[in-house]
Amino acid sequence: MSKNRSLLLIFTIVIFDVVAANGLGALLSDYVLNLPNKPILLTAGTAVMLAIQLALSPAIGYWSDQRGRRPATIATTITSLLSNLLLLPVQSWGYLANRCFKGATNGLYSVMRSAMADQTEKDELLRYSGLLSFIAGSGTILGPMVAGVLMLVYSGGRISPIPTVILLLVIGALNIGLAFLFKETSPKEEPVERKEIVKKATNALKVVSLWNQLAEADKELPGIKPMFILNMLATLGMGYYAFFVAFMTQSHLIMTPREAAWFFLEYGSLAMLANFIFFTYIVTHVNKRKTILFLSMVGVVMQGLYAFSESSQTMFYVVAGVDAITVSIMTGLTGSILSVMVKQGGSQGEMFGNIQALGGLASFVTALINSLLSGVSMKAPFIFCGLSMIAVFVWAMRLPENARKYTDAKSMEELEEEPAEA
């Protein structure tokens, strides 16, 4: 399989998985219809998924390093399909069980990042990994965007979640077929002991152990730890993505499933277009740290405007449009820089798994905090995300020199030229 076809397959597998995992959008409220504190429960489902991801992503990444990327890809796509079967009974227990199983398969994204790193050079990896990081991190936007098309063309899809669930099952089945077509990018047949897999998973739950592994990696590749902290702060700042459904359906906006579908179609389309243009044509020509500083300040303003858009759908749409073409680029940008650094350090699958696990921890924290804050005020989660954006700005300003080497270089190929110039 040619490199271009392989990369296209990687993107398709990730997009299909993201849609299959997050496609219900506003219809998720049907699963908690008769329960109190619906905004809290809607966001709590995401928190449960990310907590399980924390344990299993490093284990899946390690498995892909030992046995290859293809077996891990096939196994996670099959499990992802099975998890969506739990959504057929429209019950709260089915939704929570689905989130638990989905958390067990989110290691797929670290495997796909590893497969991409296996076959691309630094500047290619910067561009492609940026797009992949955006797609994987924007599931709560892109999933409802794609599934929203069904709601717009078929009225039954706005009344019951079942037609959408069937669509997600079809997408999941197609993804299994794509996984079997995926050619190995890191052929290995090294033995994997069950004890070692369990050890990786249990160590991941000990966040201190993961943090210590990151500190060790920083000794071999100086700069990766502060860059990862920047990525975590950006993840905290983007936590409002998982809050959108609760905000649109449970706040004074009271948007219908049809209106929510139009919103996700607008936001998702603009964000995908902005990220495609940026990572295809711009990323290798700009100072990435200055770009992050600019985006974080725009993010602070956007969060303030979101907090006061509850009374006006028009204002909400305008703010979201500006947000989509600017701030949505941030997590892809920090994630792509990390991917280049990990490629230099080796042990890609396990390291990507650790990064996804700790990134999942950041997402879990923001989902949990937003769940609790939404019980106080629907504005409060945006205030928290705004404060996180300020933290991104401050940390990027104080980024140490060994990390700035990566963020300030326009082309990643410049990094190889430095020793020769010295």
Give the predicted meaning of each segment:
Residues 57-68, 274-288, 374:
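Helix-to-loop junctions at the C-terminal end of transmembrane segments
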Residues 2-50, 223-230, 234-253, 260-264:
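Helix-loop boundary and gating motifs at the non-cytosolic
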Residues 98-136:
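Cytoplasmic helix-loop-helix junction between adjacent transmembrane helices
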Residues 345-375:
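A late C-terminal transmembrane helix in Major Facilitator Superfamily
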Residues 1-4, 184-228, 414-422:
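Juxtamembrane intracellular "pre-TM" segments in multi-pass secondary transporters
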Residues 55-91:
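Conserved MFS/SLC helix-loop-helix module at the cytosolic interface between two early adjacent transmembrane helices
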Residues 129-148, 356-366:
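Glycine-rich segments within core transmembrane alpha-helices of 12-TM secondary carriers
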